[in-house]
C-alpha cells in the first residue's frame, strides 16, 4: 500500500494544539508536536510528531474532520486522544495519541482512528467531552449525548445517542463527581 499521487500526507503541526511537557528540572516546556529532540539537565526528551497518511487517498483515508475547524475540547477516552470540532468526535488510533490516519486501507482495524458526527435532528455543536462511568458524555448548548461501543471502542461499533436535552453553558466545562455529572446553565442573570 502507498499514498495516492498528489495526496497530502501531513497535518500542519502549527495548527494543532501544543504540548506542555514537565522536564526533569521541574520546569515546563511548551512546544509544537514536531518530533524534535532536546536535552535538559542531562535528560533527553523526544517530542512526538503528528502521524502521516501512509496509504490511500482522500476517499479511502480522508483527512480528519477537525482540519480547518475550531477545536472545542480535547480529552482522553479509552486510550485514545479525542478532539471535538463542530458536530464531530475525532479520536486517534488506540494507544497512538497523534495518529489520525489509518494504518491500512485494505481492511478496517479495531485500532483505527474514529471520526464520527453526532446524530440529531438539531444542529448540535459539541462543546465538551467528559469521561464518566467508562462512557463518554458529550455536551452541546442544548443537548447531551453518550458515546457507546463494545468492550473495545472502534470506528465500526461507535454510536452517539442523545441522552437528555437540557441547556448547558458552553463557557463552563461539566465535571463528573461520584455518580453525578454537574454542568451549568444560564437562568436570567444567574448560572
Please describe what each predicted stretch is.
Residues 1-67:
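Long, charge-dense tracts
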Residues 46-79, 84-191:
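Beta-propeller and closely related beta-pinwheel folds
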Amino acid at each position: 500500500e502507498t499514498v495516492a499521487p498528489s495526496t497530502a500526507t501531513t497535518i500542519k503541526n502549527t495548527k494543532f494544539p501544543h504540548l506542555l511537557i514537565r522536564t526533569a528540572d521541574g520546569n515546563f516546556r511548551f512546544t509544537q508536536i514536531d518530533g524534535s529532540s532536546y536535552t535538559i539537565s542531562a535528560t533527553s526528551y523526544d517530542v512526538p510528531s503528528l502521524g502521516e497518511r501512509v496509504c490511500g487517498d482522500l476517499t479511502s483515508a480522508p483527512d480528519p474532520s477537525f482540519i480547518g475547524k475550531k477545536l472545542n475540547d480535547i480529552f482522553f477516552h479509552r486510550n485514545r486522544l479525542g478532539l471535538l470540532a463542530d458536530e464531530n468526535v475525532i479520536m486517534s488510533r488506540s494507544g497512538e495519541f497523534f495518529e489520525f490516519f489509518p494504518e491500512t486501507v485494505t481492511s478496517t482495524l479495531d485500532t483505527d482512528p474514529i471520526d464520527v458526527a453526532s446524530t440529531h435532528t438539531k444542529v448540535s455543536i459539541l462543546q465538551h467531552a467528559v469521561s464518566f462511568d467508562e462512557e463518554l458524555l458529550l455536551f452541546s448548548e442544548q443537548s447531551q449525548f453518550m458515546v457507546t461501543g463494545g468492550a473495545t471502542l472502534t470506528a465500526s461499533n461507535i454510536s452517539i445517542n442523545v441522552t437528555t436535552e437540557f441547556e448547558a453553558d458552553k463557557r463552563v466545562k461539566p465535571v463528573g463527581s461520584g455518580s453525578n455529572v454537574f454542568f451549568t446553565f444560564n437562568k436570567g442573570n444567574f448560572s
